[in-house]
Amino acid sequence: MTQKDSPWLFRTYAGHSTAKASNALYRTNLAKGQTGLSVAFDLPTQTGYDSDDALARGEVGKVGVPICHLGDMRMLFDQIPLEQMNTSMTINATAPWLLALYIAVAEEQGADISKLQGTVQNDLMKEYLSRGTYICPPRPSLRMITDVAAYTRVHLPKWNPMNVCSYHLQEAGATPEQELAFALATGIAVLDDLRTKVPAEHFPAMVGRISFFVNAGIRFVTEMCKMRAFVDLWDEICRDRYGIEEEKYRRFRYGVQVNSLGLTEQQPENNVYRILIEMLAVTLSKKARARAVQLPAWNEALGLPRPWDQQWSLRMQQILAYESDLLEYEDLFDGNPAIERKVEALKDGAREELAHIEAMGGAIEAIDYMKARLVESNAERIARVETGETVVVGVNRWTSGAPSPLTTGDGAIMVADPEAERDQIARLEAWRAGRDGAAVAAALAELRRAATSGENVMPASIAAAKAGATTGEWAAELRRAFGEFRGPTGVARAPSNRTEGLDPIREAVQAVSARLGRPLKFVVGKPGLDGHSNGAEQIAARARDCGMDITYDGIRLTPAEIVAKAADERAHVLGLSILSGSHMPLVTEVLAEMRRAGLDVPLIVGGIIPEEDAAELRASGVAAVYTPKDFELNRIMMDIVGLVDRTALAAE
């Protein structure tokens, strides 16, 4: 019988509503053949807020599972033996805390924690650049990344303490060269800091524990070459910069989720083929094959996938690994001159970008530069789709077709339980009432001391977890110790002429502004905890290029703060971007704040919004609703001009 290589880990990124509901989902997925867990946490957990915090309103359990305390984590992994599991936790700013809770639960299960296997993402650099779930400034955040790494070296030697995460960089518009360079710059920043925390003889092994989490887009030949370039460049950095001699410690180890940015709301059944093609990029080449793969569901552009949708993506992996003969062969592309040329070109471009970052002082000093580059690259990507230079089937070519039977009936998505947030808050209140308050206070005081003294925060975090502290209490101590960070928006003040078709819009903006007696003022806001800022940035940048007076202050603002800003700026139109599924409660609150403030201007909303919700929003007073199918930004700009022309002129 032909010898086959072992397949990669099959993961499904999952978590929603409550710890109990997510536990049931995990156990079901494991029974279906999933070989590892990939935990999605909700936004309050990711950003260090308890479920009853004002900023958490409407966000609890929406994009992942809420974890407020040890009881939640205990429930999440009920009847799942952690010593036997390989668990990936997509968590960053609160990674030390979630790992502390995980360790505490494993110890309760009787596990030998030195045998625990898994990963915390723990990459704060990409949070500043794209994802937005940061808490503290870059320097103390870097310190906590390496605190986790130094702790796992001693106590969890099989644990990956960090995923250098280029996934979200591509989602934010990075070119392959930028994705390579920005991710490698992050890896360098982490290893430079980690080298000061571990004995020299143990440093090579720690380098070997750093893993990567990457993206794979539809241009799958280029993406495969990108992965081969990653392998070569990481080996080069480990050997030349850090003097790592053992080849096994220089190995580029990575997991992947294929691209979600390219999944379309229009003709969503086509996404199945996109996902399959993108998976080939990270599985075909043995030399650059992923260690773990998780695939999005075909309907992510519509809303929250159902268990069946996730099962379909899992089956895709299983068919490739077990029915095909892919794993019977050595690397299929070694010696291919076209592949080698492309790999070398990508490496040269990445080295040039990396040298520029290094000249600025490294990744932390280059955050503003990298953010601006991503916003520019994403604007160029969107412009290519708008003009048709980049073909997207069902979006800008071949847009007519028969209705899909997949999207009939229940709307093809899972709807969040509206009672889940109230239930979670009730359990949180019961947890607080039943714990030893003095023990919690003492544990938090010790955490504060460790944070301010420079000690590793992991032991104090584990003690706080066992004492009964909450996610919000843990994060509050770090905010007190290090302060809270406001990230760059990447939206430059100067307009750009890179986009076609702007002249008629600029003329319309100038005409309306002349009648108003001042420039058309457009305030863009991101309410709640949703850190996916790409859409808001692109709307703000395009409006700026069209001649509007733009205010965009970035992410994580309350409805009251956004409305106050719009009132202070005398906005003619207010726009909200919400991609977390929390559009209904957040928009309702913004409308109430607008009424209280006497702000009578059009409100427009963009996000992943089902049509029934969009209809309800319009009925409640929202002037326009935009979803991923509305990819033509110039048309949105003309809509805004028309709204202002009809409403604000009459008022003024």
From Swiss-Prot:
Signal sequence bounds: none
Activity vs pH: Optimum pH is 6.5-8.0.
Catalytic reaction annotation: (2R)-ethylmalonyl-CoA = (2S)-methylsuccinyl-CoA
Pfam family, one: B12-binding
Disulphide-bonded residues: none
Membrane-crossing residue ranges in chain numbering: none
Effect of disrupting the coding gene: Cells lacking this gene are able to grow with carbon substrates that do not require the operation of the (complete) ethylmalonyl-CoA pathway (succinate, propionate/HCO3(-), or acetate plus glyoxylate) but are unable to use acetate or acetoacetate as the sole carbon source. They show undetectable ethylmalonyl-CoA mutase activity when grown with acetate plus glyoxylate, while are still able to convert methylmalonyl-CoA to succinyl-CoA.
Cofactor(s) needed by this chain: adenosylcob(III)alamin
Top enzyme category: isomerase
Domain B12-binding: 519-647
GO MF terms, alphabetically ordered: cobalamin binding; metal ion binding; methylmalonyl-CoA mutase activity
InterPro entries according to UniProt: Acid_CoA_mut_C (IPR006159), Cbl-dep_enz_cat (IPR016176), Cobalamin-bd (IPR006158), Cobalamin-bd_sf (IPR036724), MeMalonylCoA_mutase_a/b_cat (IPR006099), MMCoA_mutase_a_cat (IPR006098)
Residues engaged in binding adenosylcob(III)alamin: H532
Entry keyword set: Cobalamin, Cobalt, Isomerase, Metal-binding
CDD domains given in the database record: MM_CoA_mut_B12_BD
Known EC number: 5.4.99.63
Subunit structure: Homodimer.
Job of this protein: Radical enzyme that catalyzes the transformation of (2R)-ethylmalonyl-CoA to (2S)-methylsuccinyl-CoA. Is involved in the ethylmalonyl-CoA pathway for acetyl-CoA assimilation required for R.sphaeroides growth on acetate as sole carbon source. Is highly specific for its substrate, ethylmalonyl-CoA, and accepts methylmalonyl-CoA only at 0.2% relative activity.
Assigned protein family: Belongs to the methylmalonyl-CoA mutase family.
Protein name (Swiss-Prot/TrEMBL): Ethylmalonyl-CoA mutase
Organism taxonomic ancestry: Bacteria, Pseudomonadati, Pseudomonadota, Alphaproteobacteria, Rhodobacterales
